[in-house]
Amino acid sequence: MAIIKCKPTSAGRRHVVKVVNTDLHKGKPFAGLLAKKSKSGGRNNTGRITVRHIGGGHKQHYRIIDFKRIKDGIPAKVERLEYDPNRTANIALVLYADGERRYILAAKGMQAGDPIQSGIDAEIKVGNALPLRNIPIGSVVHAVEMKPGKGAQIARSAGTYVQVVARDGEYATLRLRSGEMRKVPVDCRATLGEVGNAEHMLRQLGKAGAKRWRGVRPTVRGVAMNPVDHPHGGGEGRTSGGRHPVSPTGVPTKGYKTRSNKRTDKYIVRRRNKK
């Protein structure tokens, strides 16, 4: 993994910082695990924008990732590591002893040729997936399920991890990167180790066009709009908006709590750290 700072040969190159991983596969992805990925432009089925700042970008295929890791007792080997345009983490193509191939998230330190396994009998080793009841207290894990059999939902981005801090009855307590302490059923599966490609946070795109390649459109300030477009719009000359900051739909944007799922509050032992 190398971090390259480009020379300022032009305005667009001046601030570019690249993260280059020479271990990644340079050919095409495995065709049997690709799916069509359509562009929505941030619009819903009625054609209205429901997510702003989305549109354009390079055409992509979706890589079908195995987030469940339920091929128990069948040894597997990492064939190669690959780039995935759909996520910040890299992915690993895994070949099982029965001939099946699957993509999984590439853990930190994972290399081509590494043996991996899943199930209650799997060794406590980076890349192996086990139920939380079989993982030692204090272990660092990623790709954690929130419901048994549903597939990993927690700690899937590059460089993220979760620590198993306690186990009491049918629940394990996890410490998330945000500082939140949360209970998860002990039958939920997790993969040992951290997610790889932690250097992703060090990259700098350097120019607006690099964002456009990724399908991200510009963000316009509300005070620069007309009153018909935003609550902060309008006014003669430059204004401060005239009210507390809100979204285009009028929802307060700074410190306003929008969580409404009271049903799962009982699983949160401690709220995340306040910044």
Curated annotation (Swiss-Prot):
Protein name listed in UniProt: Large ribosomal subunit protein uL2
Highest taxon above the source species: Bacteria
An annotated GO cellular component: large ribosomal subunit
Complex and partners: Part of the 50S ribosomal subunit. Forms a bridge to the 30S subunit in the 70S ribosome.
SMART domains according to UniProt: Ribosomal_L2, Ribosomal_L2_C
PANTHER family documented for this protein: LARGE RIBOSOMAL SUBUNIT PROTEIN UL2M (PTHR13691:SF5), RIBOSOMAL PROTEIN L2 (PTHR13691)
Job description of the protein: One of the primary rRNA binding proteins. Required for association of the 30S and 50S subunits to form the 70S ribosome, for tRNA binding and peptide bond formation. It has been suggested to have peptidyltransferase activity; this is somewhat controversial. Makes several contacts with the 16S rRNA in the 70S ribosome.
GO BP, sorted A to Z: cytoplasmic translation
Gene name as annotated: rplB
Gene3D superfamilies with a match to the protein in the record: 2.30.30.30, Nucleic acid-binding proteins (2.40.50.140), Ribosomal protein L2, domain 3 (4.10.950.10)
Stretches for region Disordered: 223-275
Keywords recorded for this protein, A-Z: Ribonucleoprotein, Ribosomal protein, RNA-binding, rRNA-binding
GO molecular function, one term: rRNA binding
Family membership: Belongs to the universal ribosomal protein uL2 family.
